[in-house]
Structure formats: structure tokens, C-alpha cells
Amino acid sequence: EYAEAASYYVACVQEFPLSEADDFDVPASFARAIEGPGDVAYICNPNNPTGRLVDPRVIDAAACRCEQVGALLVVDECFLGFAPDARERSVAARAACSRHVAVLSAFTKLYGMAGLRLGYLISGNAQLLEGIRRAGQAWPVSSVAEAAGIAALEDVEYVSRTRDVLAGERAWLSHELSSL
């Protein structure tokens, strides 16, 4: 989706295919491909569709490189809430005070609100945020989506219950697949 969107702006897209030989991990060379101002590097953490968490050192190296050369690192954390150590792995705090790091997330995955289209961006880059506001719709969040988001955040036990259920399901699925 992001590569397609970039093509509308005639952007040059450099992809980093993941391979089984490298355990489907984002390569350490990722940061070295970030060359200068105007570059936008995108990482999905955890990776979709593998579900593998990106090595924090790879994300840190990419963020540092973006800060050095004036580029932008966008980290999609829409699936990160499923990880038990999501708070420790998130780069949202760094993004909040950086002009060169942004975090995308949404209620779509963890809260199962795909049809409500409720998401957010965290960045300390006021120019980026203003540009997104100007490009957006007059009413970007419906009242139904807003109410659902507030209700989801008020259920403070939901995330831990969901993680517990998924841990059990993951173990069951792994067992069943290994018995094939």
C-alpha cells in the first residue's frame, strides 16, 4: 500500500525483501540505504505478514540515520499492541520529540475496529503534522469511531486479556501444525 501511494508522487521505492535464510528479519543494512533529506524509510513492527518483531537495534540505527541526514523514519506499529513487551518496543516516545521519526498506529488490529477507521500518528515534526491535517478531510473521525475508541481505552484489562487468549491460541496452533 505504501509503495503504491509513493508511486503517485513519482517516488523511487527501494524494497528490502525478507528471506527465510535471514529468519525473515529486516536486514541491518536497512539504515545504510537512507541517504538524505526527502528520503522516507518505512518499517512495519512487527512485520506483516510474518509477525516477526524488528530488532530494536535496526530501528534505532534507522532513526539515528534519519536524524543525521534529515530523512524521515515511519514506523507502523499497528500490530505492536499484540506483543507482551509492546511498551518497551514502541518508538512512540522517541517520535513525539523527533522531527525525523513518526509512528503510525490504529485501533483496527488490536481492538478489532477495522470498519471504523480509527488511527493516529505520533511525531514531533510540526510541519509534517500540519501537512497531514491540511491534506485530510474536514471530519476525519466519525462520532461512532470516536466513541468506540474512548470505550476501548477505558477497558484497561482488554489488552492483557487479549494477549492471554492469543498466547493460548498460539500454543494450540503451534502444537496442531507440528502434528501434521
Regions found by a protein language model. Name each.
Residues 7, 67, 178:
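Anion (oxyanion) recognition and catalysis
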Residues 1-43:
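PLP-dependent aminotransferase-like
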Residues 18-20, 45, 106, 134:
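Active-site donor-binding loop signature of nucleotide-sugar glycosyltransferases
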Residues 24-37, 49-73, 77-110:
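Active-site pre-lysine segment of PLP-dependent enzymes
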Residues 40-44, 74, 120-122:
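Structural motif
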Residues 100-179:
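PLP-dependent aminotransferase class I/II
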Residues 9-10, 97, 180:
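Short, structured coil segments at secondary-structure junctions
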